[in-house]
Swiss-Prot record:
Keyword vocabulary terms for this entry: Cell inner membrane, Cell membrane, Ion transport, Membrane, Potassium, Potassium transport, Symport, Transmembrane, Transmembrane helix, Transport
InterPro entries assigned: K+_transporter, K_trans_C, K_trans_N, Kup
TM helices/strands, residue ranges: 7-27, 50-70, 102-122, 136-156, 168-188, 211-231, 246-266, 284-304, 336-356, 368-388, 393-413, 415-435
Species whose genome carries this gene: Rhodopseudomonas palustris (strain ATCC BAA-98 / CGA009)
Main location: membrane
Function: Transport of potassium into the cell. Likely operates as a K(+):H(+) symporter.
Reaction it catalyzes: K(+)(in) + H(+)(in) = K(+)(out) + H(+)(out)
An MF annotation (GO) of this entry: symporter activity
Protein name: Probable potassium transport system protein Kup 1
GO terms for cellular component: plasma membrane
Homology family: Belongs to the HAK/KUP transporter (TC 2.A.72) family.
Cited Pfam families: K_trans, K_trans_C
Record-linked PANTHER family: LOW AFFINITY POTASSIUM TRANSPORT SYSTEM PROTEIN KUP, OSMOTIC STRESS POTASSIUM TRANSPORTER
Subcellular location: Cell inner membrane
Amino acid sequence: MSQQKKGIGLLVSAIGVVFGDIGTSPLYALKETFAGHHPIPVTPDNIFGVLSLVFWTVMLLVTVKYVIVIMRADNHGEGGSLALLALVTELTRGRRVHYPLMMLGVIAAALFYGDSMITPAISVLSAVEGLEVVTPDLKAYVVPITAVVLTLLFAIQSRGTGLVGRLFGPVMCMWFLTLALLGIANIVHAPEVLEAISPTFAIEFVFRHPLMSFYALGSVVLAVTGGEALYTDMGHFGRFPIRLAWFGLVLPALLLNYFGQGALLIHDPSAIQNPFFRLGPEWMVVPMVALATLATVIASQAVISGAYSVARQAIQLGLLPRMTIVHTSGEEAGQIYVPFTNWTLYFAVMALVVGFQSSSNLAAAYGIAVTGTMMIDTILVSFVAALLWRWHPVVVAVVIGTLLLLDFAFFAANIIKVAQGGWFPLFIGFISFTVLTTWRRGRALVRKQLKKQAVPLDVVLRALGPNVSRARGTAVFLTAATDGVPPALLHNLKHNQTVHQRVILTTVSTAETPYVPDSERVHMTDIGDGFHRLIIRYGFMQTPDVPAALSLCKQFGHEFNMMSTSFFLSRETYVPSLNPGMALWRERLFTFMTLNATRATTFFKIPTDRVVELGTQLEI
């Protein structure tokens, strides 16, 4: 295949995956602004003011902030809140701001899960609601149809989405072309709406109606939901294809459609009940509902896949316990399925659909998670600009300060919607933050306890006398510590009075980069007396495979035969106590998560028939 064809294929794929969320925003953004919980009178002045706000919000928050500025802050090609967090963590190590910034990154990851629950619900609901334009009698079927579509979507996740994924690009290309054509068809009847490109309309609207415009910001931000996906998916497609797709198709199509809806409302204010599905003739409504449903399913799929990816990153970065990760493609390493994440999302999405009943009710819940994440991204990237890009402090203050001011304005406009549904992402964010920080703190306490009980390796080596027999073969002891003796080895010595001829003390560590190449995967040192220390390194986007890593040790003169290799694991049982460190309820939560974590043998892909587990009890 020629480079040109590969480039076109990558571009079409990027359009299918990256822009699904922001691409389906025209279904509800303008409708919610004029007819939502804080409705705005549909007058020409207000239409021009809102259109100007939408235009400049998209240009500043997506084009300038994400496409031009933040997409430069890649972590070895990867993007997203956790990749940005890992980059900032590395840059600020040893500084006072290190811990607060790390907590901000964790909050962003927590808010992401609230967002990933709301997106499938609001997207598919808004598409199916188009049936109400055909006849109001179909309103009763909107929620059941939405539930069926989403159930099928989540049910097929375990089979992989490779085959269906090939259709994503062409379908979304058709979607964006349809958005553009519908917009143009209405703009020709009221071309004066294009004057709203001037920022003076937005400024006048804000000064004439300060309270109304503040409420409007809470809905206008719906036009940029999914903008952060441009940065999140950068690792899959690269910076250039995403930028090319944005400027070449997605941005023009979105703006044309919003201005087309504005032109429609100038001629027919009653169309505000569902302006998107009123853009075309009546015969087009049903085909448009079908196309919109496909587009929203694709948008939902992108968010679900993103949730799997964030879960894997969080596990690797020590923020979540081990979970089962299934690779659904033999060709694409990034195509994974995380059962726990999938079904947690499914039940949450179903609860939202049944509980909120309409996209308008859900819109109030949507903005908080998105604006909160965007604001944190801006704060984190300010440190990248200052410490990595070496921007002048004045440039950082002006550029990042302006973006942060905009982020805060949108966040403030959404935080007032707590009672209307904004409580949901805050609740999910709080639960997620508690889980992430409890696991991180619990693991730190465990490491501290193990270090306190650790016996120096040289003491053990000196104690190896004639009473200790040497068994044939190799023993691999997995340990989180890079010094001292693993508890499993001490237990083996104490109870069996034997040590293997070759002992490999193995630590699997996660780098603050997305990928570690095979050439840098393993590092082995000879300690003496048949003992060796092995460090296996993986990136936070990779899944550990200990047997595969052992096969790379040939460069150190070591070969491993699985039939003569035994793996020794220490299985700790944690006992909550009143010792200082964590609140008792958090210790119990940590213990519960540990008991339900995927077994180390499964997670590290170790043959179960070659494993010996030795138990130990720890107070935390």
